[in-house]
């Protein structure tokens, strides 16, 4: 691994730079938003997280042992309020999904979805995604990575806080199995082009399309996406695969 931080440090006043394991740190790509869980979310959180929560630790985990089976594993970074994540897991119960989300109301909402849908193939880690990937996920352990609608940090001075940057993409690619896929989606066109450029620059990945990809059936439209499409707004999908071993 190079000495390049996983996400570039921000300027003074833009965030706190945190040292990581072995000195590889990163600037947080999110801001902890104020928000409270509803009473229902609190109840589901208290009931479900001891059962399906992955507690952060600075050591690699055995994903097959954690899920109790050796099925394909997909990491989803940023589950939001959980509806899309739960729909994907519900439609693909032969695939195990690990959702990583820092915002408590979103985690509570996803716990509710997991309980109501009786999902056994979806688990949650409430922690910073960069640290989870860096410290807990072994190399060649994932069959797929989802990064759907990450914060675009649209102001130029905040672009360095974007999640999709070359060092983090290289780290994620190292966790993918050969043939595994890396799927990003955004409704911010300038960020979409950055995603395409960054993933194209990762030597272990190859584009599955000749540019942007059509939305695959496994990614359902969100209510915000549907509204945006009705208003003529665009959404861009970027899907790469890890090169097979020679």
UniProtKB/Swiss-Prot annotation:
InterPro entries: SAM-dependent_MTases_sf (IPR029063), tRNA_(Gua-N-7)_MeTrfase_Trmb (IPR003358), tRNA_methyltr_TrmB_bact (IPR055361). Residues 157-162 are annotated as: Interaction with RNA. It catalyses: guanosine(46) in tRNA + S-adenosyl-L-methionine = N(7)-methylguanosine(46) in tRNA + S-adenosyl-L-homocysteine. GO terms for cellular component: tRNA methyltransferase complex. Substrate binds at residues 155, 187, 222-225. Gene3D superfamilies: Vaccinia Virus protein VP39 (3.40.50.150). PROSITE patterns: SAM_MT_TRMB. It is an enzyme of class 2 (transferase). Keywords: Methyltransferase, S-adenosyl-L-methionine, Transferase, tRNA processing. Pathway: tRNA modification; N(7)-methylguanine-tRNA biosynthesis. Its EC number is 2.1.1.33. SUPFAM superfamilies: S-adenosyl-L-methionine-dependent methyltransferases. GO terms for molecular function: tRNA (guanine(46)-N7)-methyltransferase activity. Catalyzes the formation of N(7)-methylguanine at position 46 (m7G46) in tRNA. This is tRNA (guanine-N(7)-)-methyltransferase. It comes from Dechloromonas aromatica (strain RCB).
């Amino acid at each position: 691994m190079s000495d390049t931080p996983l996400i570039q440090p921000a300027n003074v006043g833009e965030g706190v730079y945190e040292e990581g394991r072995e000195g590889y740190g990163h600037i947080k790509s999110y801001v902890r938003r104020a928000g409270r869980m509803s009473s229902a979310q609190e109840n589901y959180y208290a009931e479900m997280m001891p059962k399906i929560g992955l507690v952060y630790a600075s050591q690699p985990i055995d994903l097959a042992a954690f899920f109790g089976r050796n099925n394909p594993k997909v990491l989803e970074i940023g589950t939001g309020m959980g509806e899309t994540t739960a729909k994907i897991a519900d439609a693909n119960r032969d695939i195990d999904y690990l959702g990583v989300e820092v915002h408590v109301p979103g985690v509570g909402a996803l716990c509710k979805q997991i309980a109501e849908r009786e999902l056994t193939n979806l688990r949650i880690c409430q922690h910073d995604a960069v640290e989870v990937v860096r410290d807990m996920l072994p190399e060649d352990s994932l069959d797929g990575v989802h990064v759907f609608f990450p914060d675009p940090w649209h102001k130029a001075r905040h672009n360095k806080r974007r999640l999709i940057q070359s060092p983090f993409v290289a780290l994620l690619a190292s966790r993918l199995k050969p043939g595994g896929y890396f799927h990003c989606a955004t409704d911010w066109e300038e960020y979409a082009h950055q995603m395409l450029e960054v993933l194209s620059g990762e030597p272990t990945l190859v584009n599955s399309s000749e540019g942007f990809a059509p939305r695959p059936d496994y990614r359902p439209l969100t209510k915000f996406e549907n509204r945006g499409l009705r208003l003529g707004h665009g959404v861009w999908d970027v899907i790469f695969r890890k090169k097979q071993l020679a």
